[in-house]
Amino acid sequence: MLDVNFFDELRIGLATAEDIRTWSHGEVKKPETINYRTLKPEKDGLFCEKIFGPTRDWECYCGKYKRVRFKGIICERCGVEVTRAKVRRERMGHIELAAPVTHIWYFKGVPSRLGYLLDLAPKDLEKVIYFAAYMITSVDDEARQRDFSSLEAQIEVEKREVENRRDSDVETRAKTLEQDLAELEAEGAKSDVRRKVRESAEREMAQIRRRADAEIDRLATIWDRFRTLKVQDLEGDEVLYRAMRERFGLYFEGGMGAAALQKRLQSFDLEAEAESLRETIATGKGQRKTRALKRLKVVSAFLTTRNSPEGMVLDCVPVIPPDLRPMVQLDGGRFATSDLNDLYRRVINRNNRLKRLLDLGAPEIIVNNEKRMLQEAVDALFDNGRRGRPVTGPGNRPLKSLSDMLKGKQGRFRQNLLGKRVDYSGRSVIVVGPQLKLHQCGLPKQMALELFKPFVMKRLVDLSHAQNIKSAKRMVERARPVVWDVLSEVITEHPVLLNRAPTLHRLGIQAFEPQLVEGKAIQIHPLVCTAFNADFDGDQMAVHVPLSAEAQAEARILMLSSNNILKPADGRPVTMPTQDMIIGLYHLTADRDDVAGEGRQFSSLAEAIMAFDAKQLNLNAKVRIRLSGVVPTSAMALPEDWQQGDDLDVETTLGRALFNETLPVDYEYVNVVVDKKQLSAIVNDLAERYPKVQVAATLDALKEAGFHWATRSGTTVSIADVVTPPNKQAILETYEAKAEKVQQQYERGLITDDERRQELIEIWTQATNDVAKDLEAAMPTHNTIHRMVSSGARGNWMQMRQLAGMRGLMANPKGEIIPRPVKASFREGLTVGEFFITTHGARKGLADTALRTADSGYLTRRLVDVSQDVIVREDDCGTFRGLSMPIAEKNSDGSLRRHDDVETSVYARTLATDVVVDGEVVLPAGSDLGDVVIDALVERGVESLKVRSVLTCESRVGTCARCYGRSLASGKLVDIGEAVGIVAAQSIGEPGTQLTMRTFHTGGAASESGDITHGLPRVVELFEARTPKGNAPISEVAGRTRIEETDKGRKIVVTPDDGAEEVEYPVTRRQRLLVEDGTHVEVGQKLVQGAVDPKQVLRILGPRRVQMHLVDEVQEVYRSQGVSIHDKHIEVIVRQMLKRVTIIEQNGSELLPGELVERARFEEENRRVMAEGGQPSSGRPELMGITKASLATDSWLSAASFQETTRVLTNAAMEGKSDPLLGLKENVIIGKLIPAGTGLPRYRNVRVEPTEEAKAQMYSVPGYDDVDYAQFGVGSGQAVPLEEFDYGSSDYR
């Protein structure tokens, strides 16, 4: 077998008949599969052992040779080779066709490749292939010219002969008529009898004339057709064609079906065709030019590769190995078989029938019909349903053809190559394990035993609890007591991977150290739930065991949960204490007045704890405690002679002192109430300033304290805790009066219906807000629900408002707001009518969520596909370019404050140019920008920075570490080999389900630009580079505007400053203008409200501006939903969208006009041309949507496994594409290690050697006295170096 690690590229091409025959191990001649009596394969059938190999290991068909000792022998009786049965998975056969057939992919695909090559319309092509028209394959022009006059004379002679015959026939008939009339007259017949005779004679004569004229016309037609006959003409009139063939058969050849095409392809001159097409492109315009360009692409594909166009017509069909289209016996003696077998049987049956008809010399029409049926059978085998009605099996189900085997989610690519199942895995329900450390998980004993079975068995043998592996296996299966001891020894320090589906980002699979637990549920640390998005309502998780030492090392170093504290999307901690822990810490750090022990002083924390235990001190009482090792805050009053490290009297509460015990020793004393915001700031700070180990320990301590005090806080909820605001009725009455007034104005006709709606909505929104404010003021702070909401543990004021205040305005099914509010709260209970109008929104919400999940998953899939080959390949690409970004904004008093978007823009990047303040370099280029550095710069008055960005990176493949900046997940500069493309796709896709789906309708005049697309559809629209609905034009020139009214709408006319031609922009009356008459506009300025078309931005303002536009617009959507994603992730995707250039002028290069090429290749080719003194080609940057960009990738494997599988493979085979295997998907498909992370050669080619100390420790021998072993002398304690030690020598015994 071919080893996957020994090739660098994978090429796909068109197989010729010779190729198919060389792959084959024999011809399949019969449609039989297996004998239903003996259940053995039939000879020469679709499962024949002689062709495909034996069905049993080392055993021939007739049973003469059995056992492995006959390996390789071919039985002389049955002709079967004695070998392993698994060769039936790799040996192919073939069917020799009695007539050639075309490959449906090349004839029926869009565009038809055969049609482009031969310049035939697909309809005409179909007529030829399916025997509805003849095609001329060759014309002997010389002979025709040479014999032209004699042929013409021959035709003239024939015509004259016909004329002469006609004249003589008419004459004879006239004579007969005269005789008849004379006879009748003699008999004295009546005049009408005579008239009838005359009329019938005249009719006959007219018919003779007509027949002769028709014959003459036919001769003329035949001659005209022959005279102008040229290669590739189609002739649908069979009679005419036959007559032509009879007369002038020496001068031309023609035919129908695939055979005619095959003949044409053999004589097709590719080079001449390419030359004439180039000429057309150079001189032609419009439609002709575009068609010539498309045709040239196909023609040059055949010219430049080893492919021959004859490969598109098949003389024999390959038969795939039988084990890939199996036939299995079911219980009832019936057989289940793969659809392919049925399709192959149709082909073989029709082929055999055609052979027989040809042998019998059947009439042409019957043979042609059989050939057409054979063509259809082969079409159905390759791609059933592509042409005409699909072939159906039992129950009218279309049969699955070879193409269907590859296509779609259930196809070979996505189901088997990219979605493999793995061994050493198990799954179970999860429960919480609050006693675990951050890097641990609880693994049920039975699961652990099954997963680590091989390890346990080996260890049992090593410790000689079992004689051999077999008895060890028996011991494990019987679960002997000693097995459990061995198991706990085996799993120490052997991490396992836990994964929860759906794995939306890389934190969905993490490594933990297993702790054996009783029961059958996996226990999970509460802090990693956020990363897994897990809860304990019946979720399940999967466990995987890393086997090799390398896999274990990677799991421990890269995947251990305590090393994955930061979220790759924004670089902020993901292991945040939540819910109970927050309420516990809030309870711990709150301060209360008038409680036991207030105002006391304690000499130490221990003393205060003692007082607390004696019930003399309340946890939240304000007291003074003398603490040691405190890091004071700026707000604390310090004694004059105090130094760092001295004891300090702190005004605090016992709870806060205990809370500070959980934090690192040198952390600033926290003397405030700790709610969710505060806690999040503390954890952020820890992650930024302390090593991972310290952070993990602190988080565990916070978790312990949180749960401990949450239990003791006695947080409960009862219906009495839901307090209704006291002034609710009064508030509602005032607003009711206002609403009544508006209604009256409407009824009097003073305002329109839209205005009434709008005003009512505003009134009731205000009312709802007032009730909410009243509620917030009226609720006592020690109320448990109030504490839950204000601490940030669960719920928000809006939910509170609905529970205790009023539900407010609701939307109808169309998404418009109903102008009557729901005045009741859930505490009071809703009326039937109110309940009914609330159901619309609830139902829509559920439907929305279901749709959103699917859409978001598909978006993630497309993002991954477009960015999967973006890997950090080098340390620095050496560019000087970068993007300028703001880091500060001015307050009203002129002072600077940190810009709101620094978190997602400048943070974690590399500085591109030195920062200079007053001539002094404050920060050199190449510095990493963290929180501390940015704050320092803002203090120095720096407002914006030029930073490195992926968009300006000049690496040829992937990107470089400096342009990418910090890896957000590790907080350090990104490692070479990091798959930043996948991380980016996951970071954008993972919060996709949180985005809304709705297009908001506020109904009426409130909406500014019609319906703005928001949420997920907007993100998709941007990444697919679609023109948005109701897009706003942007000015192409700088100049003054004037607005003109037309009968259809309005138009904005811009008069350029440089006196060029005026530019007009038609806009509808509904669009809100952003300019007035006489406004001065700049290039690229928006003229009306609405979304801008990114393609226009690219055309008018260039690639850099469109990149910034896309990043900002995507961020706009995510920010509006409160999702924080770093710009660099979006930049990675946008960079992939603008990676290609469309060639406009070819000039001296080899690039074809209209071709899409990667910018790197375009620049390389131009450099080559210029070095040779030629003229470089010109191109324009192209903005491609992510789907299109994925399909345009250099890797055909990746594109085929993404979408439109058959189309991608058709193209790739025709162009003889070679896959460089640079991305991740391609390597997963062929089973290589991915070229990212530790799969890169720079990490693979490493030797591990122990240090001297390690060697000494490992091999040291205890010294022994010379008394014990006198003859040896004193032991040196020196280890024997391994390489000098010969295990095989006899003296070793």
UniProtKB/Swiss-Prot annotation:
Alphabetized SUPFAM superfamilies for the sequence: beta and beta-prime subunits of DNA dependent RNA-polymerase (SSF64484)
Record-listed Mg(2+) binding positions: D535, D537, D539
A Pfam family this chain is assigned to: RNA_pol_Rpb1_3
BP terms from Gene Ontology: DNA-templated transcription
Catalytic activity, as annotated: RNA(n) + a ribonucleoside 5'-triphosphate = RNA(n+1) + diphosphate
Keyword Zinc: yes
SMART domains, sorted: RPOLA_N (SM00663)
UniProt cross-references to HAMAP family, sorted A to Z: RNApol_bact_RpoC
Self-association and partners: The RNAP catalytic core consists of 2 alpha, 1 beta, 1 beta' and 1 omega subunit. When a sigma factor is associated with the core the holoenzyme is formed, which can initiate transcription.
Similarity comment text for this entry: Belongs to the RNA polymerase beta' chain family.
Name of the featured protein: DNA-directed RNA polymerase subunit beta'
Organism: Kineococcus radiotolerans (strain ATCC BAA-149 / DSM 14245 / SRS30216)
Lineage: Bacteria, Bacillati, Actinomycetota, Actinomycetes, Kineosporiales
